[in-house]
Amino acid sequence: PTDDYYTHVRLNGREYSKKAYGPVIVRPVDKKDNYVKRCVAIAGDTLLVHDGKVYVNGIAQENYPGIQNTYTVVTNGSPINSKVLDEMGINPQECWFDAALPGYRSIPMNEDDAKKVAQMGIVSEVRQNIDVYPPDYPDSPLMLFPFSENFKWTRDNYGPIYIPAKGESVDLTLENLPLYERIISNYEKNSLEV
């Protein structure tokens, strides 16, 4: 993005940026700003997402208030008024009406909004979408980390993946190599040959 830390430093100077924003404590190796919406696991943890539920070290995690999922909304054939969606904080441009359903295959919203939508007179059904393998789109494994066809993972059924802690060793195999090869070569700057 053009509005990142490095752009601010170039425009305002290092000293001003340091005073205005404080010192940089962590800087990504790739020097890109990263957006972390919610950190659910850290070094030393094993992360698993099963049917949309997050597990860390085998323990189910509480859903955060306001967490969004995607929902299928079946209507009587009429679309929901875009002003109504907008007033609920749902971006109408992210809601695709499908007359064949009839309704919407995917509306991103939280559970409270899903309950409100279910109460609308034109709505006959609201159900949370859970991605399972094989997903609707065949390239799914190539769109999610570790970007390998060997991992039949989706957004809602992901892992388990072990996140190594500092100083720990991981036994590498051809099966788990896609999980760790980028870390080893790009971030730890070690050569890796198979």
Located regions from the model:
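Soluble "head" domains of membrane/secretory-pathway proteins
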Residues: 1-194
